Structure formats: structure tokens, C-alpha cells
Amino acid sequence: MTAHDVSADIEAVVEDTELPRRLKDEVYSTIEERGVGVDDADRIAKAVETRYLDTRVDPLDPVGTVSAQSIGEPGTQMTMNTFHYAGVAEIDVTQGLPRLIELVDARKTPDTPMMTVHLDEEYATDRERAHEVVWKIEATRILALGDISTNVADMLVEIDLNEDTLLERWPTVNDTDAIAEEIAETIESNLGVSTRQAGTLIEFGPEEPSYRDLLQLVEELREIVFKGIEEITRVVIRKEETDNGEEFVLYTEGSDFGEVLDIEGVDASRTTCNNIHEIYRELGVEAARETLINETMNTLEEQGLDDVNVRHLMLVADIMTNEGTIESIGRHGISGSKDSVLARAAFEVTVNHLLDAAIHGEVDELDGVTENVIVGKPIKLGTGDVNLRMGTTQD
């Protein structure tokens, strides 16, 4: 019995088709919505079944070649612009062909890493609460907190902290002296110096009076992260319309997926980043595969190429994640690890592959497309893998 409110005759008609359960449920929903009879239900079910069977891949169909054509041809129309104004103020992200190459090459770090951070309900609708999360994520360095000066006469670095900025960046602390003390302790632990603090003024210097050492301390001071995540240099907050209504969404320059997910107020179920390897490390290969598909599809859609069937992208993502890790499509990944000597040699560094194969006594079984084309044999796809036997008798 189905959960849908249809007659037994209609259920028998639909269940008699070769449709998968998801499509059967959609047929039931359509029949319920339109209130059709058995005859119309039969016609609907058979029409859907016909379309479904037509879309299935035929035996020996070269799905890899079709996917390569379906992605490669639109790729010729993509722009070479590395940066694109992605609808978010002041956040540049790699788009177009450079981004597509990044994805199929499975680069460890994107040219412009970024994250889209969604917030929990109590933070998503309150700008002040959302800013609390911003300051926990964005790397806060000394130049954002006050003025730095050097006292050459006394060989000291002097930091004059801005009280308003301190209270803004540490919204849960009301005492600026306590914040300044925390900053002084961070300086001591990172630079190995002794500090003197008076209110929001902090002083320190090198152990031995040296102008060179003084300037070196200033340079090292600029790199210290006093709050937030070091890899994330900037966060932009934006109010957007989502499935849950209007809410504040954060966009970051730089990414550290694991660290951000641990921050209070971040909705881990909806937060994403454009670094496939970070998602793989935190959530596993299935999440990485899904992100690979979504990122590739979004890249094509940004260029107006949204007519590429997602199944071609799914096939590429499946191949890249088939071994449980993320492999690139190239000589250091899938193409370079094929069993066929000729297929490897045809891709890149031909002489090296042939020499290595000869040294190790490798044998090419000529099972794939490339190697059969090279030696002039019919490829084992389509009619090339169908054998006819004439005059045989069947027992």
C-alpha cells in the first residue's frame, strides 16, 4: 500500500512501471493533485516511463567521452577573468575557466579561498549578535586595534590602543584595561619580550639596545593575531533572503572550515567553503564529492552555461573521489595512474612513461579507448564491443 490517497487500480497501474520509487512518488503526487481517473493515470505513468527509459544510458555508451564533450565545449566560452564580483561587496572570488581548472586539478588551496557562513537562529536575525561571530572569525591584528610608534631614544615600541575598537572587538568584556592586559600577555608569549602596561598603553623593547632589533619587533608585531582565525583576513556581513526568511550571512576572505564550525553561533549544517580538501578533511569524501559538483555547477552557471546536465559533472566527481580520496584529473592523478601504458604516455611526458614501462616489463592489454585508437584497433565501446557469430547452434 502506498501512502498516497489513490485507488487500488491507479496504484496497480503506477506500480507496474519500471520507474524508481522517487519518480513513482512524483507520479502519485501529480495524480492526486489533478484528480485524474484510471485511464489518465495509466497514460501519465506510461508517458513518464517512456521518458525515463529514453534517458537511461544504453549499454556500451561512452559516457566518459560524452561528459568530456559536454563540459569541454561550454568551457571554450568561459571567460579568463580570475576575479569576479560575486554579488558580495568587496569579496573577490576566482570564477570562469581558472576556477574550473582549479576544481578538476583538485588544487590543495584555491587562489581566492572563501567561506559562506550561515548563523544559528538567535544570531542570524540580530546584527549585534552576528557581529559577535564576525569578531570571533576575522583575524584581529595590532593595526586594527590602535597606533604603533617607535621611541628610538629609549629603544621602545609603543602601542596606543583605541578603547572604542577594543570594546567593539571584545563585546562581552567591559573593561578595556583587562583587554589590554590580555593583548600584552599575547605579545610577551609570541615575541619573548617583557611589556609594561598602563591603561591602554603598552610598551616593550629588545633585550639589547639595537635599532635593527627594534624594527624587527615591529614587523613581527604586525603579524600577531590577537583574536579570530589567522587564515581569515576579512569578513563581510550581509542581509539576505533565505528559505528561513531574511537573515544575516557572513562571507570570508580566506578559509579554515574546521575552526569556523567550532565557533558558537555558526550553523554547521549550512556553512560551506570553496576549498574541497578542507571539506574532505572535516566531513569526508561524500561531502567533498557533493561540494565538487555544486562548485562546478555554480562556476558554469556564473558564466551563463547552466544548460550542462549535472550528471556529466557527477560522473567527473565520482571518478575524482572513487578511491576514497580526492584525485586530480591530470598526470599526477587519474590520467597518470591508468593501467594502460599507452594511455599514460598519450597524456603527458610520453618518453618517461614508455621508458618506465619497458624497464618494468609492463604489458598493455588494450582495454581502453586511447590505446586502441593509437594502435588502430576498434575501441571496445558501442558496436566495437559487439561480436557476431555466424552459423552457431544453440544447445
From Swiss-Prot:
It comes from the Archaea. It is an enzyme of class 2 (transferase). Its main location: cytoplasm. GO terms for cellular component: cytoplasm; DNA-directed RNA polymerase complex. The keyword Nucleotidyltransferase applies. Keywords: Cytoplasm, DNA-binding, DNA-directed RNA polymerase, Nucleotidyltransferase, Transcription, Transferase. Its EC number is 2.7.7.6. GO terms for biological process: DNA-templated transcription. CDD domains: RNAP_A (cd06528). It catalyses: RNA(n) + a ribonucleoside 5'-triphosphate = RNA(n+1) + diphosphate. Pfam families: RNA_pol_Rpb1_5. One of its GO terms (molecular function) is DNA binding. It is found in: Cytoplasm. InterPro entries: DNA-dir_RpoC_beta_prime (IPR045867), RNA_pol_Rpb1_5 (IPR007081), RPO1C (IPR012757). HAMAP family: RNApol_arch_Rpo1C. Belongs to the RNA polymerase beta' chain family. DNA-dependent RNA polymerase (RNAP) catalyzes the transcription of DNA into RNA using the four ribonucleoside triphosphates as substrates. Forms part of the jaw domain. Part of the RNA polymerase complex. PANTHER family: DNA-DIRECTED RNA POLYMERASE, DNA-DIRECTED RNA POLYMERASE III SUBUNIT RPC1. This is DNA-directed RNA polymerase subunit Rpo1C. It comes from Haloarcula marismortui (strain ATCC 43049 / DSM 3752 / JCM 8966 / VKM B-1809) (Halobacterium marismortui). The lineage of its organism: Archaea, Methanobacteriati, Methanobacteriota, Stenosarchaea group, Halobacteria.
